């Protein structure tokens, strides 16, 4: 079975638990070390945004699900879903479209997480609920030439 679920009181140090779940799925999908690090970074960033911005660093409940499925091409889909109970996020004023390149001279703290997540993951979804938010990020592991199914 390639599913993991976790209900936790979200705190900064809990990212280690989420990362271990991500690492198991990445290993099962036979991702390279670079891919594994990138997927882990994107999941860490979603989690950090919930803890920092949604919960203002207060320990509050959150659900996390990690799943791996095959698509119609035989590629692995790594699906990570977060359910928070923070104030509903209004994405209408977010510019999550085209990611603009940056350089060391223009990098400032904050504001790079969302573009980073969109760059790494193949799909990023947000769903507003009456009592919080749902976040889904999906990574597609493309089969390399010569690999079996």
Q: Which ranges hold each PLM region?
A:
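A conserved short beta-strand within the histidine kinase catalytic ATPase domain
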Residues: 60-69
């Amino acid at each position: 079975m390639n599913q993991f679920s976790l209900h936790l009181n979200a705190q900064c140090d809990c990212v280690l638990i989420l990362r271990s779940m991500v690492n198991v799925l990445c290993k099962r999908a036979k991702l390279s070390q670079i891919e594994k690090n990138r997927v882990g970074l994107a999941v860490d960033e979603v989690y950090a945004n919930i803890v920092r911005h949604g919960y203002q660093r207060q320990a509050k409940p959150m659900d996390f699900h990690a799943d791996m499925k095959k698509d119609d091409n035989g590629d692995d889909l790594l699906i990570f879903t977060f359910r928070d109970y923070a104030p509903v996020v209004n994405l209408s004023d977010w510019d999550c479209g085209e990611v603009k390149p940056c350089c060391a001279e223009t990098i400032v703290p904050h504001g790079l997480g969302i573009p980073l997540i969109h760059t790494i993951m193949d799909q990023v979804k947000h769903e507003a609920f009456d009592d919080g938010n749902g976040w889904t990020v999906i990574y597609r592991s493309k089969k390399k030439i010569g690999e079996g199914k």
